Amino acid sequence: MKRSLLFSIALALPIAASAFEGYAEVDGINYYILTKGAYAEVAQKNGGYEGDVVIPSSIEYDGVICSVTAIRQGAFSYSSKLTNVVIPSTVTSIGVQAFMNSKLKSVYIPSSVLSLGNSAFSGCDSLQSVKVDNLESWCSIEIGNNACPLQYAKHFYVGDEEIRHLTIPSSISVVNSRTFHGYKGLESVTFENGVTSIGDFAFYECSNLESVKMSNTITEIGKYVFYSCTSLNELKLSDELPSIKESCFQECTTLSSLYVPNSINEIGNKAFYKCKNLKKIIFGKCLKKIGTMAFSDCGELTDVYSFAEVSPVFGNMYYTASTLPFSGSYPEYATLHVPENSISDYQANPVWKVFGNIVALTEEELGIKEVKDESNETSIYTLDGRTSNAAIRGFNIVKSSNGKTRIVFMK
């Protein structure tokens, strides 16, 4: 028995001794290989990579089949002659600066990839197209700072479908941070019921995005989500959203009207800062707090409607004239419409007393009178300017045949 055990150990010794850990080139691709763990990671190559690179799902080294599981830090960075890369479904991570400043033109990222390291695709200004398997996997990927390839890509494909008008289906509950960061091919996004949250920077600088429609299942949106979406002109917020966070819609310079639903009780710092074309704002009745410079530098502002019986307060303990929510928006030339019994409260509040004209909401605006659909006398529009056959629940724009226009809230 003892002799048999010694013989078994002797057989195992050469195998252990031959285990390899280090860098080696196989079929033109450099890898970090660990034969003991039977895995390999694509690594940087002297002089960089050229042309089309198809990464295999596995390689053989020293008689061991090793699965290719990752693209290491800086692997393809500064590869000035690189064109296309196909990544196998065995790869789960793409490392920090993996493709940074390369001349990559197209890349396929499989659903197996769970993370993109910081600056993974930074400076890839030759990138034409990105292709992924499905939205479910793409919306769940963890994307580091300045790592999203879509900020450079002209085309984004889910399967064989190019995405310009995006629908986030009910099968996706969370859209992770930076998922569509900087994608200039995106023109509209609609969220179906079932989506609950949108991460920070998710649609940051999508400069051609014109329309955003949120389902009422969304209860959280992060910071800087729609920052500098400079073409955004149609916005429908979730009726279950409790707050709008810091810089969420900052520099959405085309947005002209805004309806803040009753569910929202707080608006964060610079949430709508520099929305330079914003003319009309309607705040629901539950708003309690507005942050620093939330609506600053909105120089076209003419009318603000607040349905809160108690005037919302400034979100910070200390303030100066330049940090108040409407600083730089010339509120002294705008009209604030508030509940009649609350006028004195608003006049005493530093957030609101800066308005040059504070008036009572009319009965129609308060929804006391019913709006009748008489097509020969009135035209009814939604807040985003679409015509409606009848007044709908919530806010309506009603234009009478005599030229008078008013905003009406229907309960």
Regions found by a protein language model. Name each.
Residues 1-3, 395-411:
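C-terminal tail/sorting-segment detector
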Residues 14-16:
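N-terminal signal peptide c-region/cleavage motif recognized by signal peptidases
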Residues 19-21:
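Boundary of Sec targeting at the N-terminus
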Residues 35, 48-70, 80-93, 101-115, ...:
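Structural signature of tandem-repeat unit edges
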Residues 61, 382-402:
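Short, surface-exposed loop/turn motifs with a glycine/proline- and acidic-biased composition
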Residues 72-75, 95-98, 117-120, 145, ...:
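Consensus positions within tandem repeat domains that build extended binding/scaffold surfaces
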Residues 298, 318-332:
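Short, conserved loop/helix-junction motifs that constitute active-site signature segments
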Residues 361-384:
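Residue-level detector of functionally pivotal "anchor" positions at catalytic/ligand-binding pockets or at interdomain
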